[in-house]
Every structure is written in structure tokens, then in C-alpha cells.
């Protein structure tokens, strides 16, 4: 998804709505969907976290909004990674990589909308076409890399994924129009403490009791 959706989508967004500090920031990450983050504790209280597969993109977006880029970095924690693959789910947009792609696209759309960008149906059609061309160009690059390194490369499967993601750009756009009041974040810890002042005490007690039961 990072190779075939996020990377070409960011390029397509730049071409469609114009470059911005936000898009440049997101493009700077080698693995924007790694799912591994480390923060100082004071950062978490005001962090608005997405409640779906857009969580990685959402967290990076919040960090870019709230902090200077020189306070943020990416690191390699290991030489190898145990990547958990999911099915493409061509026939069911509520599962697998299909749902993941829709959630990620919606997260980008909502983040850019909060920055004053307007999205019309024509914008989404242009974005879909631009993404598709960019993604196919990147597949050519990946194929060449695989050939140079003596690796097998399944062009058919790669292009099937790109075709699905292109369709899902329109689906994400339709959902953006149909559900304009959809809340994209779970409440921040600051809001939780404001609504339930003793929540953290109760949470700490519940975790302690749960640990006792499992010990």
C-alpha cells in the first residue's frame, strides 16, 4: 500500500491541487505506514488519532500540524521486518487492502480539506487519472529494480492493486460528499479527562486488575 498507493497518490495530489509543506512532509517518509511511533508523553494529550486504517497517515499529519519538522525524524529499528500481508479484497471494499486504501485516501482528503483545499467531483476524477498514470510509472521503476537485483516481479498483481486503488479514490471521494459531518478522530486525552476527570485513575486500576488476572 505504501509503494502502490501512498507514494503515487502524494505525487498525484501535488499535481492536482498544488504542492504544500504538508505534502512535502508526507513524501519525506520512506515507510509512512510502518505503524510504529515513539513520542514524549506530553505530545499525546493533544494528539487527534484516526479511528481506522488512516491512523499512521493521521498521526504523521497531526505531528506536522502541531510541531516543527526538526522535532520529528524517522529511524530504522531493524535490518528486517516481519510484514503481515492482507488480501487485496477485490470484491469487498469493507475488508483487506481495499478498505485500508479507502480509509487512507479519506484521511488525506480530510487533512487537506482542513487546510483550506476544496475538492469537487471533477477534482477526484482528475486525481484518479493522475494517480493511475503515476502508479503505472512507479511499477515500471519497481520492475527495473527487481530485475537488477535478480528478483521476481508480478506485474499483473501489481497493476490489479493499482486499478483497485484508482477506483477507491472515487469511492473515498463519494464518501467524503455523502458524510460531510463524519468525525475523523477519536477524542484526545485532554477531552477525555475534561469529560471524565477520574478516567485515567479508573483506566490504571482496570489495567492493573487485568494484569493480575493474566499473571
Language model regions located:
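Catalytic donor-sugar/metal-binding loop of nucleotide-sugar-dependent glycosyltransferases
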Residues: 51, 61-80
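Conserved, well-folded catalytic cores of nucleic-acid-processing
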Residues: 11-16, 66, 74, 104-111
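Short-chain dehydrogenase/reductase
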Residues: 3, 53-57
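Active-site donor/metal-binding and catalytic loop motifs
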Residues: 73-94
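A generic structural signal for short hydrophobic patches within well-formed alpha-helices
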Residues: 43-44
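Terminal low-complexity segments of carbohydrate-biosynthetic enzymes
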Residues: 87-215
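A conserved catalytic-core signature of glycosyltransferases
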Residues: 32-34, 38-39, 50, 54
Amino acid at each position: 500500500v505504501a509503494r502502490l498507493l501512498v507514494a503515487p497518490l502524494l505525487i498525484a495530489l501535488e499535481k492536482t491541487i498544488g504542492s504544500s509543506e504538508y505534502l512535502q512532509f508526507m513524501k519525506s517518509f520512506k515507510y509512512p505506514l510502518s505503524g510504529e511511533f515513539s513520542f514524549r508523553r506530553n505530545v499525546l494529550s493533544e494528539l487527534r488519532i484516526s479511528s481506522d486504517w488512516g491512523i499512521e497517515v493521521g498521526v504523521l499529519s497531526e505531528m506536522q500540524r502541531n510541531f516543527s519538522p526538526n522535532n520529528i525524524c524517522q529511524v530504522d529499528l531493524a535490518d528486517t521486518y516481519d510484514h503481515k500481508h492482507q488480501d487485496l479484497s477485490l470484491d469487498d471494499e469493507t475488508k483487506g487492502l481495499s478498505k485500508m486504501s479507502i480509509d487512507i485516501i479519506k484521511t488525506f482528503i480530510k487533512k487537506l480539506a482542513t487546510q483550506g483545499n476544496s475538492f469537487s467531483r471533477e477534482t477526484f476524477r482528475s486525481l484518479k487519472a493522475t494517480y493511475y498514470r503515476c502508479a503505472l510509472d512507479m511499477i515500471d521503476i519497481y520492475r527495473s529494480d527487481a530485475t537488477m537485483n535478480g528478483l521476481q516481479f508480478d506485474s499483473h498483481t501489481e497493476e490489479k492493486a493499482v486499478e483497485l486503488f484508482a477506483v477507491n479514490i472515487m469511492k473515498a471521494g463519494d464518501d467524503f460528499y455523502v458524510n460531510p459531518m463524519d468525525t475523523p478522530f477519536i477524542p484526545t486525552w485532554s477531552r477525555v479527562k475534561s469529560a471524565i476527570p477520574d478516567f485515567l485513575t479508573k483506566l490504571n486500576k482496570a489495567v492493573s486488575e487485568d494484569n493480575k488476572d493474566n499473571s
